[in-house]
Amino acid sequence: MIQHAGLGYRRDLAEDFLSLSENSPICFIEAAPENWLKMGGRARKQFDRVAERLPLALHGLSMSLGGQAPLDTDLIDGIKEMMCRYDCTFFSDHLSYCHDGGHLYDLLPLPFTEEMVHHTARRIREVQDRLGCRIAVENTSYYLHSPLAEMNEVEFLNAVAREADCGIHLDVNNIYVNAVNHGLLSPEAFLENVDAGRVCYIHIAGHDAETPELLIDTHGAAVLPTVWDLLELAYTKLPTIPPTLLERDFNFPPFAELEAEVAKIADYQTRAGKEYRRAA
């Protein structure tokens, strides 16, 4: 069961995950299925051992939900098989596109238009039908705002989720990064207007500042106080407390520091005084 606070599984942290104490604040892990569908050897054996101990959430990198290229049915089938293998009940991916005749190796933004709402929602429904379960879509960080936009970011996110009848995977750091970079929608306005009943999962992470006006969502640093404040605010706006995961992709500190950040998430959840939501 995916609940409470978790930490993203990374191969560099395998030994730390294998030696977790019983009182660790880490209640679940998350992995990108693309990294594991064809992985074998020692790395896979370590992953399997950790996944036997902790519930697993899957978060995709390359579904290209808003793309124009046909959906990758082999990828979807591989994810479904992985969900069955690990008794995993949760999958999310980004509200973006990453294919254009081949992998672009980046998550590129979608124009916030009615046409794109219908296009993306249709593709999400196709994914859900093939997987046999509801998925969630994540608000992404983006660095170019389309002049074609007919609505703001949170209106677009809500519209897609409503038409696709899917969940919302809320990335608190991305809300902050986009607010600073574009100045179009304050974090407070985003959280006030997001479809709270659909928010079923949360990410929190660190970022780097290229300049005071340009933040990069790197997942390579500690979470900053302003982002912690937004997480606390998010919990006040939501009817229940979704599972919340700390993302850290590189530049790893001692594992105890990561556990301390996960423990801080758990503390914020407790202080919110609300029922915990299960991701499914």
Swiss-Prot record:
Top-level taxon of the source organism: Bacteria
Entry-linked InterPro entries: MbnB/TglH/ChrH, Xyl_isomerase-like_sf
SUPFAM superfamilies per the UniProt record, alphabetical: Xylose isomerase-like
Coiled coil: none
Family, as annotated: Belongs to the UPF0276 family.
HAMAP family, per database record: UPF0276
PANTHER family in the record: UPF0276 PROTEIN HI_1600
NCBIfam families (alphabetical): PRK05409.1
Name of this chain's protein: UPF0276 protein NGO_1946
Species this chain originates from: Neisseria gonorrhoeae (strain ATCC 700825 / FA 1090)
